[in-house]
A protein has these predicted regions:
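N-terminus-centered regions that define maturation/targeting leaders and the start
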Residues: 15-136
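Bacterial N-terminal signal peptides
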Residues: 4-14
Length: 136
């Protein structure tokens, strides 16, 4: 029981430190593809972020398996670029899709951060990754 209380306290603290985007904040356009991404690779795909607001210093990126509440695939933070392009392989804590039997839907979540780490905007894109042996 004590362990459950400790885990609950840790999760509450983690949620409290996650900065929220201001109400009415702009939405980012997020674009990526699984093309040329080998299965079970830790090399992140190229990501294009559009409509980043003025003052954006960094992008925080996370890949999430939307079919499993506990399956997060990491990501990382990278410096914002004028064109909003995050090059392939730029996310150092990324674990790519590795579905065993069936296609899985993933969501790429991107936050635009200012220099102090405040969230200015958010955006997502969902794509399904099909295991190589099931592709036609």
């Amino acid at each position: 029981m004590r362990a459950v209380a400790l885990v609950a306290a840790f999760l509450a603290a983690a949620c409290a430190t996650q900065p929220a985007a201001p109400r009415g904040a702009p939405e980012l356009g997020v674009e990526f593809t699984w093309k040329d991404v080998p299965p079970c690779s830790n090399v992140s795909p190229r990501i294009i972020v559009r409509d980043a607001p003025a003052g954006t210093a960094r992008f925080r990126v996370e890949l999430v398996d939307v079919d499993s509440a506990i399956s997060r695939h990491g990501g990382g933070e990278v410096a914002a670029t004028p064109g909003g392009v995050i090059p392939a392989g730029a996310l150092k804590s990324y674990r790519g899709p590795c579905p065993a039997q069936q296609p899985i839907t993933y969501e790429m979540r991107v936050q635009a951060l200012d220099a102090s780490g405040r969230v200015l905007a958010r955006g997502t894109e969902r794509l399904t990754y099909t295991p190589v042996r099931l592709r036609r």
